[in-house]
Amino acid sequence: MTYNILHRTLYEYAAPVTVSHHVARLEPRPTSMQSRESFSLKIFPEPTLRKERADYFGNQLCLFSIQEVHKKLEIITHSRVTVRREPPPAPETSPAWEEVAALFRDPVSPEVVEPYQFVFDSPQVRASFELADYALESFPKGTPLLVGARELTRRIFKDFKYDPKATTVATPLEEVVEKRRGVCQDFAHLGIACLRSLGLP
């Protein structure tokens, strides 16, 4: 299926701005599941400086600076993207989670170098023995990885309550686990932390 995508961002400032610096991450990335047929990015007013580069993950960035007085900034992109849909693998056919976790122990095999970086703790998502215990209820010995991941997701949905007033972007994961409530980002962090606690990316 091919999509024609129009994106428009408009900033209207309360007072004139003399200098502004921006990073736009708007260019669709070619992957095994999608190809970018065309892409254009227009910026008004015209930037004084403009540079494009790829970030660590291969996403295209447009860094630009407007160094003249302006009261509004408009960014318009047009993209044409073709998406290829493949049926997902049957969860039961995925390898046992222990086999996958073993791939990420030293020495790391060449085929897992890219996902290896996601095994480690990050500021918002840290592995713990408590989370490993919670995750192991979904990952008994020999459980296919995708079966366990689906069960973990189901349990998080059942065990935690969606509450937009319970957390902020800075709420530590430990507090989310203690309160058993939060929002989508908290539950995503929880799922990732559970997987990391088992040595999975």
Predicted regions located by residue number:
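Acidic low-complexity segments
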Residues: 78, 85-157, 171-175
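Active-site neighborhood of thiol-dependent amide/isopeptide-bond enzymes
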Residues: 9, 77, 141, 145-201
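Intrinsically disordered, low-complexity N-terminal segments that are enriched in acidic
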Residues: 1-106
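Functionally constrained cores in energy, signaling, and assembly domains
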Residues: 2, 13, 21-24, 70, ...
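Solvent-exposed, flexible loop/coil residues
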Residues: 17, 21, 30, 47, ...
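Flexible, active-site-adjacent loop/turn segments at secondary-structure boundaries
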Residues: 11, 15, 24, 39-41, ...
